[in-house]
């Protein structure tokens, strides 16, 4: 209950940040437009964001007879929840995410790299983790926050260019270029910090829930160590192109050498593994 309240407050903060940007850009009219825009974004995110995220990563449905579908069916039956659809992303970097507005409309995407690098037990641990996200309804929260954060980043960049080239500082309807520059930097950072606060506690809960579903926390712990190492060594092109979706993944897919990674939406892998190993 407390975690749900915290998440509601953080999502409201993202929406408020979008409205503030609208106010700076266009006064009271801009605030109204931003508020309407936020409503449309939330509505669209609820109904369509899962489809959009899967398209971003060119995910394709797995054949019904694929062994991964057999694993997820068994896990879902064990957890007493509908069986999610499983999609494959053609990328050698091992990773996975879940999406969808509710358990009845959920999907799990895995990369070819994950299937190539992990053992069947480790794959089971990862799928159980993602299924726990679905059961906890984290999937809806994640895609909504990703959609709003992406909109904030896009508007902030547009804000900067409009303030620099579309108006001058003597125009009372314009925004001073310095304000635009500050907004470009601060708004996406603030959105990222809010996303981080939403995501971190939910990752721990999904780890624990997934371990209970699979019956062996060591499977997920072993998988996390392999995924963490690979995602520091490899470059996930689609994730770098769409950084606002990074928090959807089981392991942060953004390159570890980037400064932005200091504000990771994921808790440290070492802490996650330690908690899993302490479960039994």
UniProtKB/Swiss-Prot annotation:
Compartments it resides in: Cell inner membrane
Signal peptide extent: none
Main location per the UniProt record: membrane
Gene Ontology CC: one annotated term: plasma membrane
The organism's place on the tree of life at top rank: Bacteria
Cofactor note: Binds 1 zinc ion per subunit.
Transmembrane segments: 7-26, 30-49, 146-166, 178-198
Binding site for Zn(2+): 129, 133, 203
A family per Pfam: Peptidase_M48
Residues annotated as the enzyme's active site: 130
Gene Ontology BP terms: proteolysis
UniProt KW keywords: Cell inner membrane, Cell membrane, Hydrolase, Membrane, Metal-binding, Metalloprotease, Protease, Stress response, Transmembrane, Transmembrane helix, Zinc
InterPro entries, A to Z: HtpX_protease, Pept_M48_protease_HtpX, Peptidase_M48
GO MF term list: metalloendopeptidase activity; zinc ion binding
Topology of the protein relative to the lipid bilayer: Multi-pass membrane protein
Cofactor or coenzyme needed: Zn(2+)
EC number: 3.4.24.-
NCBIfam families, A to Z: PRK03001.1
Family (UniProt): Belongs to the peptidase M48B family.
Protein name: Protease HtpX
UniProt source species: Legionella pneumophila subsp. pneumophila (strain Philadelphia 1 / ATCC 33152 / DSM 7513)
